[in-house]
Amino acid sequence: SPGHWFYKEWIRKAAERNMLYLHFTMDDNLSLDEKIKARYEGMYSGVFYDRYIRGLWTVAEGLIYTMFNKDYHVVPSVPRDYEEYLISCDYGTLNPTSAGLWGLCEGKWYRVREYYYNGRKERYQRTDEEHYAAIEELAGDLSIRKIIVDPSAASFIEVIRRHDRFMVEQASNRVLDGIRDVATQLNAGDIFFCDCCTDCIREFGLYRWDEKAAEDRPLKTDDHAMDDTRYFVRAAFQPSRFSF
């Protein structure tokens, strides 16, 4: 980000500090062959492409997931031969609680269905037990490998453990890494969203960067399904998929 202290204090002041500033792009890395460079170019778009491929200090602005395409990423809610299932959950009290059931089919992950409850809109705050009952309904009689939950939701995690049906895991809450990883999987065509997941699809069109913030961060609105999607991607895809 151009708001980073190193950019402001050193790169922008290179002349007055009597320093030589050289700009490099990925193409300047002679250790990368064309096949690897093509793969990396396909992994990123938007601000991440400008930063990681073009080597630019680019400000994060506008929609976060500009690569999300309803015509491509949204698919019919039809039966598929899913091989395994995960559930991701972003827990809220007054803010919405969002959970997604994900199924793996032929190497691709699908958000099969979702649970989205807005206590403020409904004017009723559900208890942890009521949210858990909704998760049970979301899972049905499926075998769920694990539930990935917002790490701040300690009381809800304890409720899941006490019922002893699901294995529960605290989600990674490294926001920028998670956003980058979701963008990578959208670009790669590895995650899709069944058209019944209307709240998640709606949030993709609203999730934006906070352009007034000094550092990169999303606006804390319309981000609940986006958060649970981020938790899912960080858990479902191995870290090596994202590392150089």
What annotation goes with each model-predicted range?
Residues G100, C105-P218, F237-F244:
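Mg2+-dependent endonuclease catalytic cores in nucleic-acid-processing enzymes, primarily RNase H-like
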Residues D222-F244:
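Charge-patterned, long linear interaction tracts outside catalytic cores
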Residues R80-L104:
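Gly/Thr-rich phosphate-binding beta-strand-loop-beta motif of the actin/hexokinase/Hsp70
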Residues N29-C89:
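ATPase catalytic-site recognition across NTP-hydrolyzing enzymes
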Residues M19-H23, L86, V168:
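Conserved beta-strand scaffold positions in the cores of enzyme catalytic domains, especially
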Residues L22-F24, I53, V112, A171:
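Hydrophobic residues at beta-strand termini and immediately following loops
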Residues S1-M43:
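ASCE P-loop NTPase helicase motor core
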Residues F24, I53, A99, I147, ...:
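A residue-level signal for conserved active-site and pocket-lining positions in enzyme catalytic cores
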